[in-house]
Amino acid sequence: SQVMEQFVRVGVILVAALSYHYFGGSIYQTGTVAMSGALAGGVLAVLVLWYYNRKILSGSTEYLHQWKIMPQTTGLFKRLMIEGGLVSLYSAFLILFQLIDSFKVKNALMLFGLSDLAAKVDKGVYDRGQPLVQLGLVIALALSSTFLPGLTKYFMKKDRQQFLQVAKIFLRLTTTLASAASIGLMMLLPYMNFTLFKDYKGNDVLGVYVLSIAFMAIIQAYQSIEQSRNRFKGPLVAAGVGLLVKLLTTGFFTIRWGTLGASWSTILGLLATLFVLVRQSDAAINCFVRERNFLKKLLLSLAIMMLSLLVYQGIISILFQGVHHRSQAFFVTVLGVAVGGTVFISTIIKLELFTIREWLSLPYGAKILRMRQKK
């Protein structure tokens, strides 16, 4: 449902841009059509969830009365507002960061020395990173929705050992996938930037910004773990600290370093939130980075993937003498994803970063293991 929502939303935005280019119209009409993509994507996501819900409950009459409001369930409204509100807050966390940017960055860029028009252009380039990050976070959100029921079940059963084990698996998987997505996207960003916008503007700024995928994914993982234990105050305080840091540093950093400073203020705000969440969490959970040398193996795997993509970039530069067409850039991006993904997966299998149970927790994890065993 999340992938379809993102696909439709981005598709509507592209249709709006193409319509403006070929058929004209005002920028306000174009913006209205582009904004409708969020509504269309949300409706499709609900329909997908409804379809699979009916499919799961096929042969059962439960779905006929599952939406009936019973007198004894009215007390759930408060829980829905608190727990659902916290989930919504963290789901929209980067959007709140973007809201701060919308009030701070453009004016700070003018104090940085840019003209009004140049500041608007630079802000537009900086905003390119937001949809890329949101798309990269789909995996993290999917993992959260997968592991949260299990964490809650073990917590309710007071099975501390199983709870800790599942929580650490969740954090290891999230950290690995989100880190790989961040580094891979950072390395392939020039080609992706050219594919989408036909220029290489802001590669350094966006390269820093996409690192927020990793930090935001880990933040959401910790928030899900805390929520499964009915702890809501800590994550709320952590979110407030992160937003405050972002608010206080955006203007100052942007005046000194331009949009690169705005990107670093986003990373700093996320780090502040993550720091508070880690401090509030149990040491028995935080030790996941040390077990079986997880952090060392992960950093080595990421370094090998980066090296392979640097070699790949060199080969592309020699073969094409630079990428000058969108079709070329798209092909190079897709091939780069395949190269980086293959190298990374092969490396983490070789280093035994995951246990068999952890592999089986991933989509297609069993297939990857079988393919590796055949070799």
Q: What are these model-predicted stretches?
A:
Residues 313-375:
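Membrane-proximal transmembrane or re-entrant/amphipathic helices at the cytosolic face
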